[in-house]
Amino acid sequence: MNILVVRNDKLGDFITALPSIYVLKHHNQENKVIVCVAPLNQKLAEACDFIDEVIVDDPKSSVFRLAKQLRQAHIDLSVTLFSNTRVAFAQFLAHIPRRIAPATKIAQIFYTDRIKQRRSEVKMAEFEYNLALTKSAFPDIDLSYPQPLLKFEDAKEVYQEFATSYEISKDVVAFHVGFGGSSDANWTLDEYVVLIRAVLQNGKYQVVLTFGPDEQKLCEQMQKKLKGEDIVYYISKNGLVDFAKIISGFKYFISTSTGTYHLASLVGTRTITFFADTLFASAKRWKSVGELELQEHHMIPQKNLDRHLVFNIIQKKMQSI
């Protein structure tokens, strides 16, 4: 059976789909699992050994081109974890016999199986809603998956090359101060400076600040604020897979709830993560796919007094890790 899984939005969202993709593949090893992803996630999808084929949905191309790609894949069943009118209509045009998706938005009219999940109620995490949707296709499917879900044979070699090039000899505590996606709360850069210096004080770790390829200005801002400190500044320019291999060697990855947090959890790195104090952006919804014991979640309150109290707790945490 050829099974299509659609999750063609941002990095963190795609990572929440990976457990579902894994269980669909392992439900029957003869299944061919095809994913439809955004261009950003193509290389990461291709690195997963439980994904057989990757279809890249270029949002600038026509819906008819996407439908042609889907039709050529001879898909028997599709499971759409995130839907919009474009991908729904493309599947309809491709004549996929069975099309499963959450019963949301007008796009649901193009699916054969519309599943009521009410994700806005946040009764479970996003990746758990995704897993639950696979039950609609195969009621007896085993929803368990390995953690970490993604391993690389050459991860240690890539990390060692990174460590050698930056003369790193200690365990690494990494901070990723940028944010995007569903993350709508974060510490200010000056607050991050305080947290970073708290880690530096104990002398146990090498602090690394990581940045996306389009965050050069943010990197320069942090370099000015932390001038004279023993810090490695790393701008990821070699793609998500290379970045994931490097992250897998870190002791801690500290960030707001963004795609890189999910990437760190995916490869088994211990995370300390900051979430907005709202149900939509909370840890309850956006906890990641890795071992829960390796994830430490903190909500950033909206009120200044409460925010200050939580910040003091985090600062003490940074001094003691």
Residue ranges and their predicted role:
Residues 1-321:
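Catalytic machinery of carbohydrate-active enzymes
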